[in-house]
């Protein structure tokens, strides 16, 4: 009986923790739009270099992505 009560208490505690984390304030994540850089040449090995080129194209940021290491410029949609 004591073991069953302990198991029940543990399950209730886990249930309360799960529901409490979902009751917090909801923050809407901004969508991001990506566009392959038109000015970046060669393999993209540095996110910093990619971001610099993307800024000249009017984007606030840029990242190297994919197996072929291409520079993608990123902005909020």
Swiss-Prot record:
Where, if anywhere, are coiled coils annotated?
Answer: none
Any Pfam family the entry gives: Gamma-thionin
Signal peptide: which range, if any?
1-30
Name the domain of life this protein comes from: Eukaryota
| One BP term from GO | killing of cells of another organism
The record lists its disulfide bonds as 33-77, 44-64, 50-71, 54-73
Annotated localization: Secreted
GO-annotated cellular components: extracellular region
PROSITE patterns found in the cross-reference section: GAMMA_THIONIN
Tell me which UniProt keywords the record has, alphabetically. Antimicrobial, Disulfide bond, Fungicide, Plant defense, Secreted, Signal
Keyword Cell cycle carried by entry: no
Describe the family membership recorded for this protein in Swiss-Prot or TrEMBL.
Belongs to the DEFL family.
Q: Name it.
A: Defensin-like protein
